[in-house]
Amino acid sequence: MSGIFGIDLGTTFSAIAKLNTIGKGEIIPNAEGERITPSAICFDDEEGGVVRVGIEAINSRHVSPERCIRWIKRHMGDSEFAVDIDGKKWNAVELSSMILKKLKQDGHVEGEVKDVVISVPAHFDEMRRKATMDAGAMAGLNVIGIV
């Protein structure tokens, strides 16, 4: 069963939810069984460039802290922000899209995750909202609303 999913793309943690059969919103547990996913990414240099997102990224941060990124949302809409990993520069939109892809995968147990509404802080200006929509599109999502 498909439908519209809600995503909280948070600074520290993120989550995906969907309305159940009686119209009540329910958070969908991630692949690790948790209801929230750390908004973290780690580029593993020991496993051929594997990108870890969420709990796996948090667990990897002690091995290569310089290759782990958190609090990406603070940089949404900032065209000057970039993280250099092995000579490749990653901007906030690209990094946020990785978190959204993880949420999309985790939400798939409730049906195809395509149409989403993403929540952002009230203080987000139009540039930050647009960057969030771009990250959603990059993750293969149809962002029908930003709230």
Name every feature range the model reports, one short phrase each.
Residues M1-P38, F43-V147:
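N-terminal phosphate-binding loop and flanking beta/alpha elements of the actin-like ATPase fold
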